[in-house]
Amino acid sequence: MAKTIMIIDDDQVFHDLYTEMLEDTDYRLIHVYDGDEALLKLEEEKPDLFILDMLMDMMTGDTVLLYLKSMPECEEIPIIVISGQPKQRYKSLKEVDPNLIFLDKTVTNEKLIQEIKARIG
C-alpha cells in the first residue's frame, strides 16, 4: 500500500509544485490548505508524513505543528517543514520534535524525495 503524505500549505502553487516533484513516486498525496482543514482531514485518515508550510493565513505552521504533536495519534508522524523563512526562526520547534526537518522552499526534487524516503521509505 502506498505511503500517504499530507501537504499543509495555503498556496496552490506549492501544492502543484510538490505534486509535480513527487509524481514519479508511489506516494499518495492529501492536499489541505490550512491547519483547520488538516485537523478535520485527520478525523478521516492518518498520513505517514506531513509536509508543512510555516507562513499561512488562517493558522500558522508552528501552531499546526504544536496541535499535531499534542495528538497521540500524530505524535510519531514525521514532519518536514518547508519554508522560505530562515531555519533559525523556528529553532525552538526542535524542542517539540527533535526529528523535525527544515527545508527551504527552493528544495530540489532529489532532496525532498531523499528526506521523505529517509523517514517513511
Regions found by a protein language model. Name each.
Residues 8-9, 32, 50:
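Conserved sequence signature across two-component system core domains
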Residues 12-30, 100:
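Two-component/phosphorelay signaling modules centered on CheY-like receiver
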Residues 34-37, 59-66:
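Acidic catalytic/metal-coordinating carboxylates
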Residues 45-51:
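Active-site beta3 strand of CheY-like receiver
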Residues 53, 57, 104-106:
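A Lys-centered signature of the CheY-like receiver
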Residues 57-58, 87:
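The feature encodes the CheY-like receiver
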Residues 63, 85-103, 109-115:
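Alpha4 helix (beta4-alpha4-beta5 surface) of REC/receiver domains from two-component response regulators
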